[in-house]
Amino acid sequence: SHVGACTGRDHFSGWGLDWINMGLTYLPYLHRFYAPADARAAFVAVRDLAAHYGGHIIGIPRDNLPILDRQDGSGPLWETNSEWEAVTTYRTYEGAQRAILALGAPAFLGAEAAEALQGEGVPTDVYIVNGLTLPDGALSDLVARYGAGLVTVEDGVIGTAETGVRGFAGLVASAADNKAPVAHVGITDPRIAPSEGHMETWAHFGITAEALVAAVKSL
């Protein structure tokens, strides 16, 4: 259930931090690997899961994450009758040549970063990846659309300079190889973390809106 760095102090473990890599490992045997970004997305994912045969893994985020809203403020991003989709367009800005791809729970940080970047004259779109596998051509289309680069963010281990890129970051890095610049925000040193709420833990690992802004500017 609760996965990533926001599992709570009594569940903090290597498995929790490596959940995305575990999902990728089992992906050939699964119907879907779900990574919902808020409680509403989790409801939509569970309903979709129940409607299909086959194996599934779902990483439920903490229920105190913000409920994601539409860009125009007209309401929540997902309703109870929403159809599950692999990728949701979250924020769009005119002239954007860069994009943030958020896997699951840190998606709201992408919106905060995009708003800050817009104020600095760097329009950046934001997409939420709700799970895997992605439809054929989805990543290649995004790479082609955003020639100035892509930034990924995920609440999980993304590797180190010594071990290479892992997780969702690795998936995007492979798709973008020699086609578009990429940068990644995630956990690179999982050895020590504070026994605090998940926002404090994310800040310790550098999973913040400020880190996303810096990553986009580095492209």
Question: Where are the regions that the model predicts?
Answer:
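Internal gly/pro-rich beta-alpha loop/helix module
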Residues: 7-28, 33-50
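Thiamine diphosphate
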Residues: 2-20, 50-219
